[in-house]
Design a protein with these regions (language model features):
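Residue-level signal for inorganic ion chemistry
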Residues: 13, 39, 136, 151, ...
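N-terminal glycine-rich phosphate-binding loop and ensuing alpha1 helix
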Residues: 3-67
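Conserved alpha/beta core of the MobA/IspD/sugar-nucleotide pyrophosphorylase nucleotidyltransferase superfamily
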Residues: 3, 204-284
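Short, flexible, basic/aromatic active-site loop/helix in glycosyltransferases
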Residues: 187-212
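Intrinsically disordered, low-complexity terminal tails and inter-domain linkers enriched
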Residues: 73-118, 226-240
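Short beta-strand-to-turn element immediately C-terminal to the catalytic PLP-Schiff-base lysine
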Residues: 33, 186-189, 269-270
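Conserved beta-loop-beta/alpha segment of the NTase-like Rossmann-fold superfamily
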Residues: 117-188, 207
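Residues at the starts of beta-strands that form the adenosine-phosphate
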Residues: 53-55, 173-174, 256
């Protein structure tokens, strides 16, 4: 794949979320959609992409081996593979697989098929989304120019989106999938009353992938995680809760973020109604 595209692009595919708003005991990324799991749709797009060269798949800590077997071993997706475990207890990190091999050293998956990844691994997710992304960035042990961070709960990713994002991140260093807001948005005060109304023409709904130069996003996450670790981060009421990667880069580096219009079909599966909408899009 690296011969098709001069840039080395690592995709971090996030699949560790709990999905409490789905009102189901099953994680939304593993629910069925059109004959596949929700996660499988975006995994397949990344695997078959002429742009993405490498993959880090971030899974629930208790399901890393299952995800490894289902999405990597079964797809023959890695020539050189590692399983890294971040943020686990000592007992968990010393766990063994069925053959008695330490999971923290598990590797293999020789002989990648054409159209798969040059390098791939599974890592355990963290307490919050940004912790999971940081674990994913820390797992990159190969040459990397750009990082594409994508929610596994967004199944309708396309190669065209990836192409537009690559062009933008190569030019600007930071680019995120987005679409212009269709709705008028209100800013609320603490009591639930309207405080202000931003100009709708300037309001965008943010999606994923969110794409950055590797060195930029690595520096940004190391800064934010370092502040939390050493207790130097601003108090909770002084900064908003981090909900996406662009916020991390904005806060830590001030680097401008380019918005890339990827349309309205790139929805996130959050509620049962979203599954129905995605089914309709897949039917065409």
């Amino acid at each position: 794949m690296s011969e098709k595209n001069g840039a080395r692009v690592t995709a971090i595919l996030l699949a560790a979320g709990k999905g409490t708003r789905m009102q189901s005991s099953r994680r939304k990324q593993f629910m069925e959609l059109g004959g596949k799991t929700v996660l499988q749709w975006s995994f397949d797009t990344l695997k078959d992409s002429a742009i993405v060269t490498d993959l880090v798949l971030v899974a629930p800590p208790e399901e890393t081996e299952e995800v490894w077997n289902r999405y990597l071993t079964e797809n023959g997706a890695a020539e050189e593979a590692y399983t890294a475990f971040k943020g686990l207890s000592e007992d968990e990190s010393s766990a063994k697989d069925r053959e008695g091999k330490p999971l923290a050293e598990k590797g293999g998956c020789d002989g990648a098929a054409s159209g798969s990844f040059d390098h791939a691994c599974v890592v355990a997710g963290g307490a919050e989304r940004y912790n999971s992304v940081f674990n994913g960035i820390e797992a990159i042990r190969w040459p990397c120019d750009y990082v594409f961070i994508h929610d596994g709960a967004r199944p309708l990713l396309t190669e065209e989106m990836l192409e537009k994002l690559l062009a933008a991140v190569e030019q600007y260093g930071a680019a995120v999938a987005a679409c212009p807001s269709k709705d008028t948005v209100k800013i609320a005060d603490d009591r639930g009353f309207v405080a202000s109304t931003p100009d709708r023409a300037r309001v965008w709904n943010i999606q994923t992938p969110q794409c950055f130069e590797y060195s930029l996003v690595k520096q940004a996450y190391e800064t934010v995680i370092g502040e939390q670790t050493h207790g130097t981060a601003p108090q909770q009421n002084e900064k908003p809760k981090i909900t996406d990667d662009a916020m991390v880069v904005e806060y830590a580096t001030g680097h401008p973020i380019r918005l890339v219009d990827t349309g309205y079909r790139n929805i996130k599966i959050t509620t049962p109604e979203d599954l129905l909408t995605a089914e309709l899009f897949l039917r065409g």
